[in-house]
Amino acid sequence: YKKRIENFKNNPIGYDKIVLLGNSITEGGGDWNKKLNAENVVNRGISGDITDGILNRLEEIVYFRPIAVFLLIGINDIFNSDKPEQDKVTVKYVANNIIEIADRIKSKSPKTQVYIQTVLPINRELFFESAGYFPEHKIPLNIQIIEINKIIKNIASQRNHQFLNLHTAFIDDKGRLSSEYTTDGVHLNDNGYSLWAELLIKHIRVLNNN
């Protein structure tokens, strides 16, 4: 985490940029310019990041007043949320934080378009196969993810944020992250990144043509 922040300091965002903000799922996309056929997209994903982490590092983002920010965050918050010290991390807490991130960006950089992307589904069986364990949850993770997405959808439109439903495109017929798009039930493979890029590219084109 610290190394990545250090890297950001040495390679500032710059002006007239589009920022992809999130956790390892965003970071794992590497050079998004190639994927999105653009020259001004900056990857600000940090592996393991949570909504509170993003709230703490927004200064760097708003300083450069980007054209747009595409936010995808939340899975790490709830992944281990059944640990005793994680009591406060409820579906509502995570959803409110996501909206708070978008609100703060907008209040400090009013011309920035904020795109809130839905939390992606997970595939418990594939994760277990890959990692050999899966944390226990009183409420299944995919149910929590759907709840978070519902809340952010309802509030996003009221607050003038854009809402991008990625979730539907990535699920299989059992409502899990489709094995076609994932390496381990949580992270994306090349097919997953291609699909995501496909869903973003039209928005990137419009933003860059304005």
Predicted regions, residues:
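Serine-esterase "nucleophile elbow" of acetyl-processing enzymes
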Residues: 1-70
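Alpha-helical cap/lid subdomain in secreted, periplasmic
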Residues: 34-39, 55-210
